[in-house]
Amino acid sequence: MIIKNLQEFYRLLIPNVPLIAIDYGNKKLGIALSNQERSIAMPLNTITEINKKIVITSLLNIIEKYKVCGVIIGLPIDMSGAVTEQTNIVMKFAEELAKSINLPIYLQDERLTTKAANNLLKSFGVKRKDRNNNDDAVAASMILETVLDSIKNI
């Protein structure tokens, strides 16, 4: 189920169970995982498959392996806050994922996270090829960190 309110999302979470975040792109998905205490967001991996059924199966495997209790998906909206074509693509993906899992899904504004992740990796001297392979997972960890910071105040 897709939850639009962060407080409601938080109420549905099981204490001391991790969360995952997804940075959804047309060519790849970045995945991040929190620790059980939800104090740290870590890049987990990148899914480079574009077939949605395979992507959802991969996500189900990750959800089962790490026993997560909630999913955060980065929602790409433009700088003015307007919905874009990519926003609609991500919302459709979230709806498809919601049909496959019985977990709360929260859509988090992800403006500029991939760019920020790429810049962060660049500042650490990561080569361009490696940045492109890892920036989505790092972006997912930034999306997750934003939510983790927000739920600390609930």
Swiss-Prot record:
Keywords, in A-Z order: Cytoplasm, Hydrolase, Nuclease, Ribosome biogenesis
Pfam families: RuvX
GO CC, one annotated term: cytosol
Location of this chain's protein in the cell: Cytoplasm
Any one biological process term the GO annotation gives: rRNA 5'-end processing
SMART domains recorded: YqgFc
Alphabetized GO MF terms: nuclease activity
Enzyme class: hydrolase
EC number annotated for this UniProt entry: 3.1.-.-
Function per UniProt: Could be a nuclease involved in processing of the 5'-end of pre-16S rRNA.
Family to which the UniProt record says this protein belongs: Belongs to the YqgF nuclease family.
Protein's name according to its UniProt entry: Putative pre-16S rRNA nuclease
Species assigned in the record: Rickettsia conorii (strain ATCC VR-613 / Malish 7)
